[in-house]
C-alpha cells in the first residue's frame, strides 16, 4: 500500500509563514530572509511555508527549521532544512544545511544558539552542489554507500517493508509493524521540523548524513538534544502536519546527505541494502543473498560498522576462506552467506572474481582471524579498502 506522499502546487512567493516560538518573534526581517531562501532552495512549488525559530540570542542570531509545505494529497512531498542566521545591522545572513556558509556560521554562533555537539556534526557537512573538481566528480555518496545506520526500530525485531524507494529521488522507504516504536538509526542531534511540533523529525548525524522520520505520533520535542543510536523518537502514525497523506500507521524513513535528499538504493541500513523497482514504492531488499520484496519482513541486524562487510556469496552458499589473497591459496574454512565480517586490511592484487551485479575486482580482504575472502563476495559499500591496505 502506498504510504506518505507529498508534491507541490502553489507559488512560494505569495504564501504565509509561521514563526515559533512567539518569544523569538521580533522577526519579520528574519522570517522574510528565511522565506526568500526557501524560494531558492526548494526543488518544487509549495502549498505554504514555515519559519520555525528554535533558538535566538538578542535578535542577532537564530537557529531553526524552514519548511516548504506540501498539499494534503497523495504523492506530495514537503521539503525542509535546518538554518542558522546572523544579523549585521538590519541585514540577516541565512544559511541552510548544505550551504558552504552553514558550517562556518554554526561554528561562529554562540553556544546558546548552536551547541558544541551540533557544531561538531555540522562541521562534517559540505555543500550539496560541490564547486571543486574533486567534489563535483564524486557528489554526495561518491561511490561510498556506508551509513553506519541500523533500521529505525529495535535490534532483533522484524518489521514489514510496506513501501519501496519513493520520493523525488527515491530517498524514502515505508516501514510498519513490531512494537511501533521508532528509534534513532544512528547517534546525532534531534529536531522537529514542523511548527506543530508533531510528525516529522530529523536526526543530524556525522559524515554529512541525516535521517528523516515522518508520520510519527507522540514524538519527542527536545530540539537540539543529543540522541544515541536506538533512542526513542516517536511511534508510527499517520500525522501529516507538513502536508502529504498517509494511510495506515507507519514511518516514512528518508536518507539525506549534505542537506540533499539522496536515493536510498544501495545504502546499507540495518545490514540490508534496498534497491529500486520499476516504479515508486516497488523494489526489494538484500541481506547477503537473502532477498525480500514489498510486504516482506526485515530483521534488524543492527548497524554495519565502517570497517565491516557482509558476506554475499551471490546465491552460492558458504564462502571459502583462504590463507592469502587469492583462490590459489589454501582453504582455511568457510564463512556463511549473510555473515558480518571484520576487515583488518585489503590487498588489491589478488585473483580476479565477479560477484553480484557484475562487480569484478582483484581486491581481497583480510579478516580479523587472518583469513582472506574476495571483495567480490563482500558487501562493504565501496570498491575501495575500508581499513587500509595490508
Regions found by a protein language model. Name each.
Residues 81-137:
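Short beta-strand edge/turn micro-motifs at domain boundaries
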Residues 184-220, 241, 245-250, 351-364:
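Zn2+-dependent peptidoglycan hydrolase active-site motif and core
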Residues 1-26:
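Secretory targeting and sorting signals
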Residues 146-149, 181, 247-308, 375-390:
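Acidic, glycine-rich catalytic/binding loops that coordinate metals and/or anionic ligands
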Residues 161, 188-190, 224-239, 338:
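A structural signal for short beta-strand/turn segments enriched in small hydrophobics and glycine
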Residues 26-51:
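Short, non-transmembrane alpha-helical segments in secretory-pathway proteins
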Amino acid at each position: 500500500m502506498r504510504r506518505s506522499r507529498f508534491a507541490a502546487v502553489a507559488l512560494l512567493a505569495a504564501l504565509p509563514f509561521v514563526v515559533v516560538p512567539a518569544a523569538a518573534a521580533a522577526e519579520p526581517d528574519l522570517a522574510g530572509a528565511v522565506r526568500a531562501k526557501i524560494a531558492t532552495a526548494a526543488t518544487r512549488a509549495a502549498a505554504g511555508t514555515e519559519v520555525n525559530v528554535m533558538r535566538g540570542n538578542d535578535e542577532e542570531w537564530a537557529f531553526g527549521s524552514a519548511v516548504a509545505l506540501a498539499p494534503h494529497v497523495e504523492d506530495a512531498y514537503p521539503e525542509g532544512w535546518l538554518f542558522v542566521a546572523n544579523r549585521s545591522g538590519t541585514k540577516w545572513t541565512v544559511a541552510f544545511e548544505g550551504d558552504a556558509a552553514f558550517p562556518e556560521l554554526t561554528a561562529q554562533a554562540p553556544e546558546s544558539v548552536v551547541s558544541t555537539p551540533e557544531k561538531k556534526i555540522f562541521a562534517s557537512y559540505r555543500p550539496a552542489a560541490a564547486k571543486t573538481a574533486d567534489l563535483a566528480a564524486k557528489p554526495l555518496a561518491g561511490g561510498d554507500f556506508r551509513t553506519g545506520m541500523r533500521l529505525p526500530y529495535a535490534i532483533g525485531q522484524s518489521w514489514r517493508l510496506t513501501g519501496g524507494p519513493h520520493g523525488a529521488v527515491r530517498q524514502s522507504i515505508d516501514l510498519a509493524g513490531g512494537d511501533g516504536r521508532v528509534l534513532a538509526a544512528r547517534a546525532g542531534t534531534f529536531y522537529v521540523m514542523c511548527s506543530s511540533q508533531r510528525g516529522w523529525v530529523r536526526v543530524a548525524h556525522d559524515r554529512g548524513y541525516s535521517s528523516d522520520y515522518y508520520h510519527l505520533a507522540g514524538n519527542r520535542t527536545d530540539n537540539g538534544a543529543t540522541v544515541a543510536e536506538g533512542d526513542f523518537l516517536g511511534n508510527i502514525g499517520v500525522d501529516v502536519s507538513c502536508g502529504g497523506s498517509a494511510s495506515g500507521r507507519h514511518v516514512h524513513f528518508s536518507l539525506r546527505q549534505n542537506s540533499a535528499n539522496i536515493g536510498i538504493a544501495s545504502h546499507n541500513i540495518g545490514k540490508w541494502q534496498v534497491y529500486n523497482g520499476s516504479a515508486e514504492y516497488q523494489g526489494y531488499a538484500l541481506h547477503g543473498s537473502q532477498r525480500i520484496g514489498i510486504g516482506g519482513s526485515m530483521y534488524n541486524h543492527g548497524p554495519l560498522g565502517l570497517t565491516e562487510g557482509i558476506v554475499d556469496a551471490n546465491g552460492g552458499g558458504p564462502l571459502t576462506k583462504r590463507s592469502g589473497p587469492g583462490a590459489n591459496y589454501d582453504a582455511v574454512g568457510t564463512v556463511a552467506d549473510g555473515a558480518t565480517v571484520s576487515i583488518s586490511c585489503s590487498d588489491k592484487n589478488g585473483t580476479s572474481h565477479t560477484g553480484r551485479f557484475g562487480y569484478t575486482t582483484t581486491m581481497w580482504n583480510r579478516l580479523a582471524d587472518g583469513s582472506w575472502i574476495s571483495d567480490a563476495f563482500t558487501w562493504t559499500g565501496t570498491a575501495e579498502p575500508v581499513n587500509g591496505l595490508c
